[in-house]
Curated annotation (Swiss-Prot):
GO CC, any one term: cytosol
Similarity comment: Belongs to the SDO1-like family.
Protein name: SDO1-like protein C21C3.19
Major site of localization recorded for this protein: cytoplasm
Keyword list, A-Z: Cytoplasm, Nucleus
Any one GO biological process: ribosome biogenesis
InterPro entries given in the database record: Ribosome_mat_SBDS_N_sf (IPR036786), Sdo1/SBDS-like (IPR039100), SDO1/SBDS_N (IPR019783)
General function of this protein: May play a role in RNA metabolism.
Compartment(s) of residence: Cytoplasm; Nucleus
């Protein structure tokens, strides 16, 4: 399910030093999925891409695609469905906030 940026939610999972992030449609959908796993993942996540941040400091910073090696080392698999399921199940839901909106000062 594709959602507009205004509705996107990050789900962040940090088992050790690296934070892994997926983009979900919105927080209520993630909570609905957590209660009812029969809801298709395609209704919850925008894609099956897993990200980390360029600075490895939580969920802030530029998102970069996590390598297969990072996924294997952390999750024991690089299979996207398994990794996304783990992040959705145990991750922290962070509502999206627009980046780059600046007021011009004269």
């Amino acid at each position: 399910m594709s959602s507009s940026k205004a509705n996107q939610t990050r789900v962040c999972y940090q088992p050790e030093d690296t934070t892994f992030i997926i983009i979900a449609s919105n927080g209520p959908d993630v909570m609905r999925w957590r209660k009812d796993k029969t809801v298709p993942l395609t209704e919850i996540v925008d894609s099956f891409q897993v990200f980390t941040t360029s600075n490895n400091k939580g969920n802030e910073g530029q998102l970069i695609t996590a390598s297969k090696q990072e996924l294997e080392n952390t999750f024991g698999t690089s299979k996207d469905v398994d990794v996304v399921t783990k992040i959705l199940t145990d991750g922290k839901i962070i509502p999206h906030r627009e980046h780059g909106k600046h007021k011009e000062v004269n």
